[in-house]
Amino acid sequence: CRNGNMAYIVPIALTSSDSLAGIHNLLLSNCEDIHISSYSVRPQPVFKNAVVNTSILLFRKTYSTCEHLYSTKMYRKGRHFNLQSLVDNLKFIDVKDLVLYGRIPKISFSIEHNILTKVLSKKRLGEYIKAEGSPIVYRFAGGRYFKVITNYSNSSSAERTVYFEDKFANPIGCILSSNLSFWFYQIYSDNLNWKNYEFSEFRIPDMNDETLEQLELLYLEYLSDIEHNANIRQTNDDSSYKVSSFKEYKIGKSKSIIDKIDDLICPLYGLTKEETKFIKNYDIEFRLSGEEENS
């Protein structure tokens, strides 16, 4: 009925999937106001027995075009967590102007809205990708709080290789290793897989020759550090792994270098010092909790 309110608990894919674009169009064409709050299953489920990432969708069916699409960040269950306090203090922000195809950003604060607006004004990463050239290899699955981006393969079944013009490859690999890139991934993805669309929709700022050189050197420093901190784990006959050993990255140990990357690139996107600090500290309670694993 007109002006009826409905609420659903749904998988978080509602915010982050090509296949849900049709549902988005249906809602945006018929509901004047929509609210979506999102909740992670890691490090612990926010809702007991809800062992998947979830969203709560609330909308008012008005048979008119959407005027406000309100979203929240993806909430996690941390120390001193209180569910009632969370529910009473959900922070929504209008993200109607920041929707991508099948993707509704999971943000809560005006500072995030400002940052995302600036990032989206830059050139799409997909416009730099070539059929051949210098490789950048990224993990499209795994890596809960940090993503693994290298210029070489680790023979993982969950890695994908893309190619760039030689002068851009390492600088782009550096940018993709940043806190800013992780934040963009978190807000637009299902937090399980780094899909082609989300990867290609990340934005790259204008870079002069000096900046390209700085990013190149910083990326080489970063790669050296993550390899130094990596562990080689041996498996046994009872293991579910089908290899005798595998490399386990501890990317969090390189956080100080990652922060240096953001100090360099965030001003290129037009971010202020306050906005850069927000990005560097985004979800830091969980990212540096020791639970991280990038095998």
Pin down the residues of each PLM region:
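Short, ligand-facing micro-motifs at secondary-structure edges
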Residues: 38, 142-153, 179-192
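Signature of N6-adenine DNA methyltransferases within the class I
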Residues: 1-133, 149, 153, 157, ...
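Basic, amphipathic alpha-helical recognition segments used for DNA target recognition
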Residues: 160-201, 208-228
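Non-catalytic DNA-recognition/assembly elements of restriction-modification systems
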Residues: 90-123, 206-295
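Extended, non-catalytic structural segments that build the interaction scaffolds
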Residues: 156-165, 249-254
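Short, well-ordered beta-strand micro-motif
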Residues: 56-60, 163, 203
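Generic beta-strand/beta-sheet core signal
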Residues: 9, 39, 59-60, 139-141, ...
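Short, glycine-/Ser/Thr-/acidic-enriched flexible segments
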Residues: 13, 64, 142-145, 152, ...
